[in-house]
């Protein structure tokens, strides 16, 4: 699971240089095909939209939980997940379906 997290500056610069952007009602995702054969991700919840650390940590926990279901799907993509302002205005199941639909769209377009 630790191998699935983007951490290096080189990985982030590669992602921002060659990104494809995908939008949904709750997320913005930057995606870039990697050569590793599995999904790697990072989560960016900023202070401007989510004021308290409790909110930001809850967002990260929920997104990590959703991504855990995707780890064994062998999707060779690096993604940066950015939640939108309305993230807390719906239940977990809607967020999960929204993110899964975005990942399917990415999988179809990235190849």
UniProtKB/Swiss-Prot annotation:
Enzyme class, UniProt record, top EC level: hydrolase
Cytoplasm found in the keyword field: no
Reactions that this protein is recorded to catalyse: Endonucleolytic cleavage of RNA, removing 5'-extranucleotides from tRNA precursor
Any one GO biological process: tRNA 5'-leader removal
EC number: 3.1.26.5
The entry's keywords: Endonuclease, Hydrolase, Nuclease, RNA-binding, tRNA processing
InterPro entries: Ribosomal_Su5_D2-typ_SF, Ribsml_uS5_D2-typ_fold_subgr, RNase_P, RNase_P_CS
Gene Ontology MF, one: tRNA binding
Keyword Hydrolase listed: yes
Pfam family, one: Ribonuclease_P
One cellular-component annotation, GO: ribonuclease P complex
General function of this protein: RNaseP catalyzes the removal of the 5'-leader sequence from pre-tRNA to produce the mature 5'-terminus. It can also cleave other RNA substrates such as 4.5S RNA. The protein component plays an auxiliary but essential role in vivo by binding to the 5'-leader sequence and broadening the substrate specificity of the ribozyme.
Subunit text: Consists of a catalytic RNA component (M1 or rnpB) and a protein subunit.
Similarity section: Belongs to the RnpA family.
Protein name, entry field: Ribonuclease P protein component
Organism of origin: Malacoplasma penetrans (strain HF-2) (Mycoplasma penetrans)
